[in-house]
Amino acid sequence: MTVVDLHQHLWPEAFVSALSARTEPPFLRGSTVVLGEGEFDLDLREHELGRRLAALDRDGTELAVVSLQTTIGLDRLPPGERAELVEIWEEGTLELVASADGRLAGLSAGGSLDGFVGAAVGSDSLANLDALAPLLDELARRGAFLFVHPSGGPVEGRPPWWSAAAVYPAQMQAAYMNWLAGGQERWESLPVVFAILAGGAPFQLERLATRGVDVRSTLHDNVYLDTASYGRRAIELCIETFGVAQLVYGSDIPVADAAPTLRAVLGFGESVAHMIRDVNPTRLLP
């Protein structure tokens, strides 16, 4: 077994250069990333391979699964621009994976699946499962998994934390409900991981129960929730609702500080932490 972090983001040097060369969102201005939802200061050193491997050692993580966060807005670009940036990220990521001595695995950002353990998509894409079907069929054929991440989007006149606290959870709740409504029955064996506890899925299941839905019918052993950005109370509720076998550890490094979530997971004791960080995510990997 391997201690795994299923939710990290890593920008290859060529991708950083490509963002720095742009003048429309998403782009980099020095160490500030300019997105449709605002401007955010970054420490670009967090995307250096050596520093990332040191962070894995610090957290006791043996393998990190890295993806390109859909919140930067590539899905809102013209197809040609998006495809160019995706290709740069995927090629650079495969090079980093090859250089990391087995410490990294990658998720496709929408290009080729070759060399990747799965694919990451934005939450909004689950609103049109027919359009997503070719990717889902191919993932199922390969025995790979789908990772659903918040899509993000432009916001105006809101504080910097607005998207993370209001937009992302709502998007993930909608994605989770879209999957329950139309995806699960079509791809019942495809492993699907919803980031950030699907935006608070247990609360939504209680709402479903008030509408006459048998909550037990919504629990599926191919659907997983990652723990990124949450602490003990939220994780405990998910364990009570879904069972510990459906939770996987995610940190959202370098976007979020991993320490609070990691501390919460470890606080449940060795057996629970072993399931969330080791047994469950390992089931998703080839």
For the regions a protein language model found, what residue spans apply to each?
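Active-site gating loops and adjacent loop-to-helix segments of metal-dependent hydrolytic enzymes
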Residues: 9-46, 77, 83, 153-169, ...
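Long, low-complexity, intrinsically disordered polar/charged segments
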Residues: 27-30, 34-35, 112-125
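Short, well-structured secondary-structure segments
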Residues: 43, 52-56, 60-85, 92-96, ...
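Short glycine-enriched loops at secondary-structure junctions
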Residues: 69, 110-112, 150-154, 254-255
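Catalytic pocket-lining loop regions of alpha/beta-barrel enzymes
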Residues: 115-248
